[in-house]
A protein has these predicted regions:
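Catalytic domains of carbohydrate-active enzymes, especially glycoside hydrolases
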Residues: 25-40, 161
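Active-site glycine-rich loop that binds ribose-phosphate moieties when present
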Residues: 145-164
Length: 288
């Protein structure tokens, strides 16, 4: 089996304890030589400053290729592009451009009066600067707000045509879900690489709730597996095995890149990567 290229998603810490956990995650996973790491942007733009700080610190302290999430929510065009310019000034040239989730308790996305109306407008503006590699989100089981799968794929094509060069998918539980989506994208004329998003399941109850909220289908057999694993105190063993099997199936189907949603908890992601043959780089200086 071919060894995949990998990347990781982190989220910015809000507390000192969370900061320690983020850096533990970075120190654990960075030796695996990720192609890039991304840093999220909270719902409603709630972590805007935290994201900016985390992106700058990660880039400066680690030398990793850091991709900053950037959204359209609750900011004018001028403010949003100023943040992007701050990233560029700090040496960060990769952005994950998203519409963004509306603030909790709101009735859906409402553009800022002077802001970008949607993700395509944001992508186009970023592309015009010529400063960034732009990635976008994709939904193998369609975005919850999309009318249908065809409309969702058409929207993804618009994002690629606006200037994005790659797409990262929402997580899913079965490889065939991704393959059907990939085939549909190719049929729609989307030639940009589509990177599967992988969620190693740290907590089945939480993962199940999140899957339901974002429209990810939950196979019935997963409930049975985790019910038994939790009773037998083998949750992590099952989670590692399932994620490894999913990734292996994707690689066998031609996937070359995998993007892991780490939730700032590195152990399962590290174990899955090791099982896939992704191991820390060792130099002569390390062993001398």
């Amino acid at each position: 089996m071919k060894t995949p290229r990998i990347s990781f998603e982190f989220f910015p810490p809000k507390t000192l304890e969370a900061s320690f956990r983020l850096w533990d995650t970075v120190h654990t996973l960075s030796p695996l030589d990720p192609r890039f790491v991304s840093v999220t942007y909270g719902a409603g733009g709630t972590t805007r400053e935290l994201t900016r700080e985390a992106v700058g610190t990660l880039h400066k302290a680690t030398g990793l290729n850091v991709a900053a999430h950037l959204t359209c929510v609750d900011a004018s065009r001028e403010e949003t592009l100023a943040i992007a310019d701050q990233f560029a000034t700090a040496g960060v040239s990769e952005i994950v451009a998203l519409r963004g989730d509306p603030p909790k308790g709101s009735n859906g996305f409402t553009p800022h009066p002077q802001g970008f109306g949607d993700s395509c407008e944001l992508i186009s503006a970023l592309a015009e600067t010529g400063k960034f590699t732009i990635r976008v989100g994709a939904y193998p089981e369609k975005h919850p707000e999309a009318a249908d799968s065809r409309a969702d794929i058409d929207w993804l094509k618009r994002k690629i045509d606006a200037g994005a060069t790659e797409a990262i998918t929402q997580f899913f539980f079965e490889a065939d879900t991704f393959f059907r989506f990939r085939d549909a994208c190719v049929a729609a004329g989307i030639n940009a690489p589509i990177i599967p998003g992988i969620l190693p399941i740290e907590n089945w109850t939480g993962a199940r709730k999140f899957a339901t909220s974002c429209g990810t289908q939950i196979p019935a057999w997963l409930d049975d597996c985790f019910d038994k694993a939790i009773r037998d105190d083998r949750h992590d063993l099952l989670a590692t095995a399932l994620a490894t099997e999913l990734c292996s199936d994707l690689i066998e189907g031609g996937v070359e890149d995998l993007h892991f949603y780490t939730l700032n908890r590195p152990e399962l992601t590290r174990d899955v990567c090791h099982a896939l043959g992704v191991t820390p780089r060792v130099t002569l200086r390390d062993v001398a």
